[in-house]
Amino acid sequence: MSLRDKLNELHERGLAEIQKSTDLKDVNQVRVSLLGKKGPITEVLRGMRDLDAEERPKVGAFANEIRDDLTAALTKRREELENAVLNARLAKEAIDVTLPGTPVAKGEPHVIQQIIDQIEDLFLGMGYQVLSGPEVEEDKYNFEMMNLPKNHPARDMQDTFYITKEILMRTQTSPMQARTLEKHDFSQGPLKMISPGVVYRRDTDDPTHSHQFHQVEGLVIDKHITMADLKGTLQVLAHELFGDKFDVRLRPSYFPFTEPSVETDITCFNCGGKGCNVCKNTGWIEVLGAGMVHPNVLKMAGVDPDVYGGFAFGVGPDRFAMLKYGVDDIRNFYLNDVRFLTQFTKKG
């Protein structure tokens, strides 16, 4: 039998063995047995040395064709088996898309965040900036630049979590007044900003107090700002949050960083201003503190109080939420009880 005949026989036998392979291991074994260094094709090619010079290149070229054809057949069979394995796995792990899916619970903004978002949207529409500041604050900004020097008796009104003698957990969002006033360029226009955030007090948690709660600081500084501007702004805020039927009343009060200072009341939710046990028969409920910015606060921030003035106010979203929805215990907002919180969502 000539070498060409032997190669033809190996070619036919090899193709048959490749086709009979049932897994990738079989394919690899056939490859080694046919094309390996000790395989029959290699053995046949060793006999080429006995051929004459004219026949040798022809047989060599034919042998390479056989080798290439077997290699292509091995590659094709390997791909067929790999696809078969993949298809079997996909069939086994198939998902029936006609079955109803498991619903994923959708989150909703917390009721207090809803109040904050409503306040932000209102003041953004009025041209205010919304700024945020650090919760770990310097004594300088939290107290001193708010007209509360060391040993000032008004500091006792705000029991404070101190980290060091000069670093504390802010007791109010008012420090953003000082931080913003320091940087503002009044040649570019007036300063109008609100600053929502979390504040901390060393209070014992009870139905109306929490050691951690929210505030929204408001500040407007420009020439010729008056108390009428403050009252008008608070009236708009009350109408936005509670409705047009609620009126605003200002009462004299004291805050170190404003002069004059006022407590702001709105019409009682329960009786509509007629007087009841909720409002202690006054027809009004206190909701926030405000006032005209104290000249000392302006001076310490490098602003001339003879040229510029303005007003500031501090809103408590937690208290607003309690009043708006008739919640009698502030702690309920922080217990993560979905049954309670869902009342204040679209789903509730």
Curated annotation (Swiss-Prot):
UniProt-annotated location(s): Cytoplasm
Organism per entry: Levilactobacillus brevis (strain ATCC 367 / BCRC 12310 / CIP 105137 / JCM 1170 / LMG 11437 / NCIMB 947 / NCTC 947)
Keywords tagged on the record: Aminoacyl-tRNA synthetase, ATP-binding, Cytoplasm, Ligase, Magnesium, Metal-binding, Nucleotide-binding, Protein biosynthesis
Protein's UniProt name: Phenylalanine--tRNA ligase alpha subunit
Obligatory cofactor(s): Mg(2+)
Origin superkingdom: Bacteria
One GO cellular component, as annotated: cytoplasm
Family, per entry: Belongs to the class-II aminoacyl-tRNA synthetase family. Phe-tRNA synthetase alpha subunit type 1 subfamily.
CDD domains: PheRS_alpha_core
